Amino acid sequence: IDCVVGTTGLSDDTLRSLADTAKEGTCLFYAPNFTTGAVLMMEFAKAAAPYFPEAEVLEFHHCNKKDAPSGTAVRTAQLISESRDLQSVAPGKETEIEGAQGARGALIEGVPVHSIRSMGYVASQEVVFGSMGQTLTIRHDSWDRTSYMPGVLLGIRSVKKCDGLVVGLENFME
């Protein structure tokens, strides 16, 4: 039986274990994010990253979210890092004042990531790029959980065409 899983925060070890348990001829599809807009945002950030020396990720979620930063924010930072051969040149932790450690965000593969948890959000993320004289902001907002359904349906329809472990909705978006 093919399987479609949507959750956040699975470790690489857990993914390897899942890949090992997937029976031959079946597909285990894991999506850290089912919103097509969020997947496109990550792809756009990956494309922009080589052209900007500074990049930061800001993610906003409801106050009951169990992980910080979100899996989407972590993956975005990884994609930015992979697509360029430099870390952000934005001021780092050395600029944090005493008593405000963490104000510059968590560094994930050289990219500062900031997590905000508050009532009123479902899920939002923006990636801010900077270079001399310009900034580029790429933002995605989910205001309602119905935004996940097109990606869920795409995953369900596409899982029949794959074998083994497939990670990420972008693998099915043409």
Residues covered by each model-derived region:
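Well-ordered, non-transmembrane segments within structured domains
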Residues: 1-4, 139-141
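Conserved beta-loop-beta element that borders a ligand/cofactor-binding pocket
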Residues: 27-28, 32, 37, 53-59
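Glycine/charged-rich beta-loop-alpha catalytic/anionic-binding loops adjacent to active sites
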Residues: 22-30, 131-138
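Short, ordered loop/turn segments at secondary-structure junctions
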Residues: 8-10, 33-35, 62-63
